[in-house]
Every structure is written in structure tokens, then in C-alpha cells.
């Protein structure tokens, strides 16, 4: 997997590392952005309870409200990933 570059986060290190591991596995198994997002969302819902939101893409803007400690925005290669819980 390409290097992870965190742009913004208020997530604890342990959960953040878990998000990176889930994303790595999803990106290894899928090439479509919506499929990568779906895998990450389902896994986060399963591990940490509902309701997680995941956006994966090369170019997008965002302005979201999230639970405290449940937000990370990062890049893996050319893909940006926004993962947060509401």
C-alpha cells in the first residue's frame, strides 16, 4: 500500500490505525471507489457501531458534522478517504 498521509483527524491512534488497515485491505481487493467505500463503511459499522460514512475519491469537497473522536481524512496515493461517524 502507498504511504498514508493524514490531512485532518481527531481520531485516537488505535482506531485510526484500524481504519488504515481496513482501507488497505479494501483497496487490495477492490478497484472501484464505491466498492472501497462500501467495504470500509460496513467494517466500521460492524466494529464500532452505526452510523459511519465513507467517501473515497480523487477530487471532492466536504463539510461534515461528526462525533467527537470519530473523524479522519487521509490520502493513500492519489485517493482521498474521508471516514467519520454521526
UniProtKB/Swiss-Prot annotation:
Q: Name one GO cellular component term.
A: meiotic spindle pole body
Q: What is its main location?
A: cytoplasm
Q: A Pfam family for this UniProt protein?
A: Dynein_light
Keyword terms, alphabetized = Cytoplasm, Cytoskeleton, Dynein, Microtubule, Motor protein, mRNA transport, Nuclear pore complex, Nucleus, Protein transport, Translocation, Transport
Localization recorded for this chain is: Cytoplasm, Cytoskeleton; Nucleus, Nuclear pore complex
Q: Does the keyword Disulfide bond apply?
A: no
Q: What GO molecular function annotations does the UniProt record carry, in alphabetical order?
A: dynein intermediate chain binding; plus-end-directed microtubule motor activity
Question: Superkingdom of this entry's organism?
Answer: Eukaryota
Ranges in coiled-coil conformation:
none
Q: Answer whether the UniProt record assigns the keyword rRNA-binding to this protein.
A: no
Q: Which GO terms describe its biological process?
A: establishment of mitotic spindle localization; mRNA transport; nuclear migration along microtubule; nuclear pore complex assembly; protein transport
- Tell me the InterPro entries matching this sequence: DLC_sf, Dynein_light_1/2_CS, Dynein_light_chain_typ-1/2
Describe its assembly. Answer: Homodimer. Cytoplasmic dynein consists of two catalytic heavy chains (HCs) and a number of non-catalytic subunits which present intermediate chains (ICs), light intermediate chains (LICs) and light chains (LCs). Component of the nuclear pore complex (NPC). NPC constitutes the exclusive means of nucleocytoplasmic transport. NPCs allow the passive diffusion of ions and small molecules and the active, nuclear transport receptor-mediated bidirectional transport of macromolecules such as proteins, RNAs, ribonucleoparticles (RNPs), and ribosomal subunits across the nuclear envelope.
Task: State the family named in the UniProt similarity comment for this chain.
Answer: Belongs to the dynein light chain family.
Its function, per the record, reads: Acts as one of several non-catalytic accessory components of the cytoplasmic dynein complex that are thought to be involved in linking dynein to cargos and to adapter proteins that regulate dynein function. Cytoplasmic dynein 1 acts as a motor for the intracellular retrograde motility of vesicles and organelles along microtubules. May play a role in changing or maintaining the spatial distribution of cytoskeletal structures. Also a component of the nuclear pore complex.
User: Which named protein is this?
Assistant: Dynein light chain 1, cytoplasmic
Protein source organism: Candida glabrata (strain ATCC 2001 / BCRC 20586 / JCM 3761 / NBRC 0622 / NRRL Y-65 / CBS 138) (Yeast)
Amino acid at each position: 500500500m502507498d504511504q498514508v498521509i493524514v490531512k485532518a483527524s481527531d481520531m485516537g491512534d488505535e482506531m485510526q490505525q484500524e481504519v488504515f488497515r481496513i482501507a488497505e485491505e479494501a483497496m487490495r481487493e477492490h478497484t472501484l471507489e464505491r466498492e472501497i467505500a462500501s467495504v470500509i463503511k460496513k467494517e466500521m459499522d460492524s466494529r464500532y457501531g452505526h452510523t459511519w460514512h465513507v467517501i473515497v475519491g480523487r477530487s471532492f469537497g466536504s463539510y461534515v458534522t461528526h462525533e467527537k473522536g470519530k473523524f479522519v481524512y487521509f490520502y493513500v496515493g492519489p485517493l482521498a478517504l474521508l471516514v467519520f461517524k454521526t
